[in-house]
């Protein structure tokens, strides 16, 4: 018997290197999002043909079979409030993401951060991203997507920009460009991991 599709689903994924973040992530998530389904992908076993974060597009494709609208969150994202309203901002046929302002500033190009990705259905760019991570020489999933959408017109076709508060990265604090009401604080990198451990020990 076929399972009925959910209308909304939040997903994340981790492997043995990052699963220490999971308890902290879930504690914050469920504090603010009771009733909003969460699916966790085990990246130690899921999509064995891919490594690490390159599994992310595969997880999103799998989730598109489970729900009409999906939000991916990295496990180093601190969920500070309900994110249910984020589903209302999703645009069909696009990946909905926040601009990575620090990377854009430092590189001179427009980057979008792949730590938070929202979408409806199964956008064409999602399958293209999955195919590209299988053959890429780029160092991460975000770099792969950026290389695919570097051209302004291509980016306009496939990426829809979400408000800054839905993915405020650690370097935003350093650059002093944080939004007023942060919904998702993304503690990126080694220093971000240190901050997460500090919060877990409080």
Write out the residue ranges for each language-model feature.
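N-terminal anchoring/stem segment of glycosyltransferases
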Residues: 1-55, 65-66, 153, 188-196, ...
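Extracellular/periplasmic catalytic domains that process cell-envelope and extracellular macromolecules
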Residues: 3-5, 90, 108-111, 175-180, ...
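Residues that flank catalytic or metal-binding motifs in active/ligand-binding sites
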Residues: 6, 56, 73, 112-115, ...
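A residue-level signal for conserved active-site and pocket-lining positions in enzyme catalytic cores
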Residues: 10, 29, 60, 76, ...
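Lumenal/extracellular "mature" regions of secretory-pathway glycan-modifying transferases
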Residues: 24, 30, 36-56, 95-113, ...
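Non-transmembrane alpha-helical segments in soluble domains
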Residues: 26, 30, 84-87, 130, ...
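GT-A fold catalytic core of metal-dependent nucleotide-sugar glycosyltransferases
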Residues: 52-111, 118-119
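Catalytic core and acceptor-binding pocket of nucleotide-sugar-dependent glycosyltransferases
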Residues: 119-202
């Amino acid at each position: 018997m076929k399972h009925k599709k959910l209308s909304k689903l939040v997903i994340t994924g981790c492997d043995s290197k990052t699963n220490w973040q999971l308890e902290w992530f879930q504690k914050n998530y469920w504090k603010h999002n009771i009733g909003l389904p969460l699916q966790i992908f085990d990246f130690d076993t899921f999509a064995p043909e891919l490594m690490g974060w390159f599994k992310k597009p595969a997880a999103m494709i799998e989730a598109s079979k489970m729900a009409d609208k999906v939000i991916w969150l990295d496990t180093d994202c601190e969920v500070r409030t309900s994110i249910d309203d984020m589903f209302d901002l999703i645009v069909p046929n696009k990946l909905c993401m926040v601009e990575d302002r620090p990377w854009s500033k430092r590189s001179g190009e427009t980057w979008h951060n792949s730590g938070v990705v929202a979408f409806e259905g199964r956008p064409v760019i999602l399958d293209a991203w999955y195919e590209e991570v299988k053959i890429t020489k780029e160092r991460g999933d975000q770099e792969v997507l950026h290389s695919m959408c570097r051209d302004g017109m291509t980016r306009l076709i496939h990426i829809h920009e979400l408000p800054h508060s839905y993915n405020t990265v650690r370097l935003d604090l350093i650059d002093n460009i944080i939004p007023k009401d942060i919904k998702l604080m993304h503690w990126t990198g080694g220093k971000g991991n240190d901050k997460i451990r500090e919060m877990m020990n409080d």
